[in-house]
Regions:
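N-terminal pre-triad scaffold of radical SAM enzymes
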Residues: 4-57, 74-83
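Short gly/ser/thr-rich secondary-structure transition/capping motifs
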Residues: 2-4, 70, 157-161
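Conserved AdoMet/S-adenosylmethionine-binding subsite of the radical SAM
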Residues: 106-260
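Conserved dinucleotide-binding and phosphotransfer motif residues
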Residues: 94, 149-150, 293
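N-terminal-biased segments
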Residues: 14-15, 22, 40, 44-45, ...
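Short glycine-enriched, charge-decorated loop/helix-capping segments at active-site entrances
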Residues: 97, 190-196, 267-276
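Iron-sulfur cluster-binding cysteine motifs and their immediate structural context
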Residues: 31-38, 57-76, 86-101
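Auxiliary Fe-S-binding modules of radical SAM enzymes
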Residues: 2-15, 212-216, 225-297
Length: 297
């Protein structure tokens, strides 16, 4: 599986204390994404400028002369950089690092079981997130089976924009689906993410039906609330109306934040400035809307 991070002691990706495995690659293009390194799935060069000690090793090493000094600061010409990663091998300060790495199921298992005791005492487990982990369905199925056989609680965080056959492969090994819904309006969804939400909504309905008729998993819906995108009472009311007819165990609202801006800079990208954090009172308003539809928050 191609991943870009393993985060321990997470308390935001399902119940209890969890280990979150972040897969690389996503088939949506949400402009507010706080994990830009997860999107392309291709290898990238990350530059942590605050860790650079200006030793100059990368200046001498780079055949394309992508590294240089400007005003006493280390700069990277991304237009000529070929992401060969030779510079990362000589950067002992770890200012230059590759984004992705390939890990097999055995390596993932070894990393995950390190925190098994925390899982047992907190009701936690492992969450596969991203990116979109279901784009690597064969690898995901393999590691889910391993975790399930060890009695580790398993969760998959997905945007749902995949063929339902992928869900069918992992349903027997998944205890919880964290299912992202951005909008109900199809045209708005395509504008914000680059894709229609028709498949996403249809897959959620299918998961709901399986859950209701004996599926041995929980279904949580997570809604990013983004000012300048979907933070609209009318849109949230439509989502609530849609979810009210489904077998949803819980709904969570994730207010947009700007903590990912530094990641964009480290990749040589510019974060969009059109998105805003919604005020707390707006979150309370939509909680009331969902509450009136008897959706558990």
């Amino acid at each position: 599986m191609k991943i870009f991070n393993i985060q321990r002691f997470s308390v935001y990706d399902g119940p209890g204390i969890r280990t979150a495995v972040f897969s690389a690659g996503c088939n949506l293009r949400c402009g507010w994404c706080h994990n830009p390194e997860s999107v392309s799935g291709a290898q990238q060069l990350k530059f942590n400028a605050d860790q650079c000690i200006l030793c100059g090793r990368c200046f001498d090493l780079c055949e394309k002369k992508a590294h240089g000094l400007c005003g006493g600061l280390h700069t990277i010409n991304r237009n000529v950089c070929e992401v060969c990663l030779n510079c990362t091998k000589e950067c002992y300060a770890e200012a230059l690092v590759p984004v992705c790495r390939e890990v097999n199921a055995a390596e993932l298992e070894k990393s995950i079981i390190t925190d098994e005791e925390y899982f047992k005492h907190s009701g936690g487990g492992v969450t596969f997130t991203g990116g979109e982990p279901m784009l690597q369905i064969c690898d995901l199925e393999e590691i889910l089976k391993i975790c399930k056989n060890r009695g580790i609680h398993t969760a998959v965080d997905t945007a749902g924009a995949v063929d339902f056959g992928s869900f069918e492969k992992i349903i027997p090994y998944c205890d919880l689906f964290l299912y992202d819904i951005k909008t109900f309006d199809g045209a708005l969804h395509k504008k914000l993410t680059g894709q229609s939400n028709e498949l996403i909504l249809e897959n959620l309905k299918k998961l709901s039906e399986i859950s209701k008729t004996g599926g041995n998993f929980k279904l949580w819906v997570r809604i990013p609330v983004v000012g300048g995108a979907n933070a609209d009472i009318g849109e949230m009311t439509k989502i609530a109306g849609f979810l009210s007819g489904l077998n949803i165990d819980k709904c969570e609202f994730m207010a947009y934040h700007k903590l990912g801006e530094g990641k964009y800079k480290s990749l040589g990208l510019t974060a969009a400035d059109s998105f805003k954090t919604p005020p707390p009172e707006f979150i309370e308003d939509i909680k009331n809307i969902f509450g009136r539809e008897n959706i558990k928050i």
